[in-house]
Regions:
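Noncatalytic alpha-helical scaffold of FAD-dependent oxidoreductases
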Residues: 1-164
């Protein structure tokens, strides 16, 4: 978690859940100056317009202002259903159109849209022999698309309609 806070990462599901900054409710940090001073930041209000949100200075700054010693993060419920596809677009433009179409059709159900290079796929296959190659030969680029919902079975997940 420390590395994620230091870099403000988002991961594969950033498109749905946001980055670490968005999901951090509170922090405790050991300040660089004055050395050793412990600062606690955050509160229980989701929206707080009473002044600067000081905890944001410590997220994504790689420890420049202090070292995060504790963090309180928002937890999201696990989806009750999920559909994932690994797709090889015919071109960069086709990949961008796919993103636009997925956003239009699935809206808030779109959970992940990630590009994966041939080198990344090859590395996975090299280091995880239990994983089967999804394509032969490996494409220059593939897209991981995921939709999910906390609801029971839904008609929103007609992936064939989008991808075929």
């Amino acid at each position: 978690m420390g590395g994620m806070l230091a870099a403000n990462t988002g991961g594969a599901r950033l498109i749905r859940y946001g980055d670490v900054r968005h999901n951090t409710l509170g922090l405790q940090a050991l300040l660089m100056q004055p050395p050793g001073e412990l600062l606690e930041m955050g509160n229980r209000l989701h929206k707080n317009n009473t002044g600067p949100d000081w905890k944001q200075l410590f997220i994504g700054t790689a420890g420049s202002y202090g070292i995060v010693t504790q963090a309180v993060l928002r937890a999201h419920p696990l989806p009750r259903q999920r559909a994932t596809a690994l797709i090889v677009p015919s071109s960069l433009e086709a990949g961008l159109r796919l993103l636009q179409d997925a956003q239009a059709q699935f809206a808030d159900f779109l959970t992940a849209f990630e590009g994966i290079s041939r080198n990344a796929l090859a590395s996975v296959l090299r280091h995880l022999p239990q994983v089967n190659a999804p394509f032969d030969p490996l494409p220059d680029y593939a897209l991981l698309v995921e939709v999910s919902s906390s609801s029971a079975a839904s008609e929103h997940f007609d992936l064939d309609k989008l991808f075929m």
